[in-house]
Regions:
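Acidic/histidine-rich, metal-coordinating catalytic segments
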Residues: 118, 126-141, 213-216
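Mobile genetic element proteins and their domesticated derivatives, centered on retroelements
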Residues: 14, 30, 34, 63, ...
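Basic, flexible linker segments flanking DNA-binding modules
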Residues: 1-69, 162, 217
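An active-site-proximal beta-strand-loop segment
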Residues: 68-101, 107-108
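Conserved, non-catalytic sequence blocks in retroelement Pol enzymes and Pol-derived host proteins
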Residues: 4-7, 20-23, 65-66, 81-83, ...
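RNase H-like polynucleotidyl transferase catalytic core
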Residues: 43-48, 131-135, 150-168, 184-187
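C-terminal domain-tail junction helix/linker
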Residues: 149-153, 175-218
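Active-site beta-loop-alpha junctions of metal-dependent nucleic acid enzymes
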Residues: 85, 103-125
């Protein structure tokens, strides 16, 4: 069970997963068994990544005081292949449900990457009232702003230098790296594309969310 879920589950989620199989154990017992078996939830590690600069004035955060707003969040993160090559993952997340609506991987971090990713989400889901992003050049480009205007979606922006304004999708990308990327090797972008798609399907449909289960875990 631990192995089949990307080694991502610590004692609280393992307790919930076992309960789904009608196997009920106290969390302290599960922790003891995990220690004796050398099982632990995977931990994150850091790597140095390329940096980008922004030459734009601050634009408004429209959803800061609207936590229940009908909004999507979008971001780009860096991933690395075995040969050291950087590739780029763009993702669209629905803030209400914490579901990934679309994603795209590319060898170039350009406007085309974010346009394709957003267009995929719009083709399969009802458009949001707001889209929240950082102020990277891809998201402030004429083409991207024009697409939002065409669909009458208001663009909300994180404050410059404050990535946690986009915390939910930052959190998803962090989980992706900790629970999957750092555990495997990717000899090609094709391997990475396949494994990221599998992880996102698991994340959307199978990964246990303690907050949503309303079950006492301590």
């Amino acid at each position: 069970m631990w192995q089949n879920n990307y080694k991502a589950y610590g004692a609280p989620r393992l307790r919930l997963a076992l309960a789904d199989l009608n196997l009920h154990h106290g969390i302290n017992r599960i922790r003891r068994l995990m220690r004796s078996a050398g099982i632990y939830s995977v931990m994150s590690r850091r790597f140095n990544k390329p940096t980008t600069t922004v030459d734009y004035s601050q634009r408004p955060n429209l959803i800061k005081h609207l936590p229940a707003a009908n909004a999507w969040s979008m971001d780009i993160t860096y991933l690395k292949l075995n040969n050291g090559q950087w590739v780029y993952l763009a993702s669209v997340l629905e803030l209400r449900t914490y579901q990934i609506l679309s994603h795209q991987i590319s060898t170039t971090m350009d406007t085309r990457l974010v346009l394709i990713t957003l267009q995929r989400a719009l083709s399969t889901h009802q458009k949001p009232s707001y889209l929240h992003t950082d102020m990277g050049s891809q998201f402030t480009s004429f083409g991207f702003e024009n697409l939002l205007n065409h669909h009458k979606i208001d663009h909300s922006y994180s404050k410059l230098g404050h990535p946690y304004d986009n915390a939910r999708i930052e959190s998803f990308h962090s989980l992706l790296k900790r629970e999957m990327i750092y555990q495997f090797r990717f000899p090609s972008i094709a391997h990475l594309i396949l494994d990221v798609a599998k992880y996102i399907h698991w994340f959307n449909n199978e990964r246990i969310s303690i907050a949503n289960r309303k079950m006492k875990v301590a």
